[in-house]
């Protein structure tokens, strides 16, 4: 979030935010402390045209853990840069007593970066120590079962991996926005999410938005009390209420 001061005006730019993540508890206290006497509030409006249920990340982790306990081989499609979702996946794997793996250097490096920067401040929540999945040790890994968190860029590796796993014991937890594989315009721009899902016989969607819902947006406006509010990242005709 940014406070911009110029020509005697104070502008508060929120960027993306939400209240239903692990860091959401700091949203309102931060605004009350710093977002005072604001002339213009620039707030995200991604969810203004959606009525998605925004469950808390804790619930996301709980649902994932239940799936991880039910299936021996679990692959999770998630963003490498979503620190809170990665924490949910890590905690779910711990609850299910399964080892967490990655299969790309980028996913591994982002987890390492998050650990170095945020582990201590988050009391271990954002501390990650995944193992790298390697095909030369696959038989040993298969015996114990695993959780593999990956992105669409690894589709060729995942396709190769699936040939070695029994279909009935393998599942994909799709942990991204459903619009990527449902909305024709989104598929036309980037078909990789749909193609990735279609590799699997068993698929379950477990996700919550990375953006503020309408209730949270209204609460932010009520706390900041700006003279003017500008919504960004929204559909053209979307309104708060």
Give residue ranges: language-model regions:
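C-terminal regulatory/interaction regions
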Residues: 91, 95-97, 125-241
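Short low-complexity, flexible loop/linker segments enriched in glycine and/or proline
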Residues: 115-118, 219-221
